[in-house]
Amino acid sequence: MAAEEDGSSNMDSDWSGAPSFPGSEVSEEWVPVDEGIKLRVITWKPTSSKSASTVVFVAGWGSLFEGWRPLISEWSSERTIVYIETREKKSSEISKKISESDFSVDKLSSDLVAVLRFYELESTQIDWYSSSLGSTILIDSFNCGRLSGRSSILLAPNSEFKFPFWAKALIVLPLPRFMYPIIVRLAVWAVERKVKEEGQRIRYRRALLSQDLQKMHLSARSLMKYSLPDNLDGISFPCAVMTASSDKLHGMDRAMDIIDRIPNCKFIEVPSNQYAHEADVIKEIHHFQLLE
């Protein structure tokens, strides 16, 4: 097993460095959000165009920035983008002993509030873009009134986090570090069986090989106990769920159920999950946000 397959060595470059793109200025910071915890936040600001409202970007569980490079490389020349990496990712700096409770949706939600406070951003003025776990965190936060927005596009949200039986068994057990490479192999195998889109499969494999598996293990323990509230009537600003019928990992039926529960929620169907990571999706984003 190569060293990177336990999330420990030469994948660190995936979790640091501020990607620079034409037409924007970039900065990278580790923002304190909780005692002993800092999150990596990357910000792009257009150098020439007059930016519309700020986009705050919250990616999925363990998601690497590289998967979003095609979209952000284009989008950053016209919009100020604040890209937040949540605490289960390898990029988070954690200087305290951690437990399952440190990775609850409530904690992840509080982190977003702390980042907005750090940058003096008012949530009601934000256009949110999120994926998977990021979308779930936001739905929960919007519903309880912790966060709001000008608009929110929620790509492939999860109402709950279902793991295969064998994965549940591994998640609940205390695992020694030497087991981590085995877990990675099993996770890659499971994803490659489940995911049909080639681009999505490549992104997930790379992400799985790049994780801090202690963080991900504790995060999975917390998430497997979580589900969105049945009543999402607390959300009162424009939201859209974006998904693709080809995305078997997240599931169209689950996305449609969430749409039915969020008041006046719109549905944006895209050709593939990969499409939502590329620059072409900007036209769908603009249409929903009425920027075109």
List PLM regions with ranges.
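An N-terminal hydrophobic leader/cap segment in hydrolases
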Residues: 1-30, 42
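Conserved HGGG/HGGXW glycine-rich cap/lid loop of the alpha/beta-hydrolase fold
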Residues: 10, 37-94
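Active-site loop/oxyanion-hole signature of alpha/beta-hydrolase fold enzymes
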Residues: 83-129
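Flexible "cap/lid" loop of the alpha/beta hydrolase fold
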Residues: 139, 143-178
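Conserved alpha/beta-hydrolase catalytic His-Asp/Glu region
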Residues: 163-164, 180-233
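Short beta-strand/loop motif that positions the catalytic acidic residue
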Residues: 235, 241-243
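Conserved alpha/beta-hydrolase "acid-adjacent" motif
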Residues: 248-254
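Catalytic active-site module of serine/aspartate enzymes centered on a nucleophile-bearing elbow/loop
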Residues: 264-292
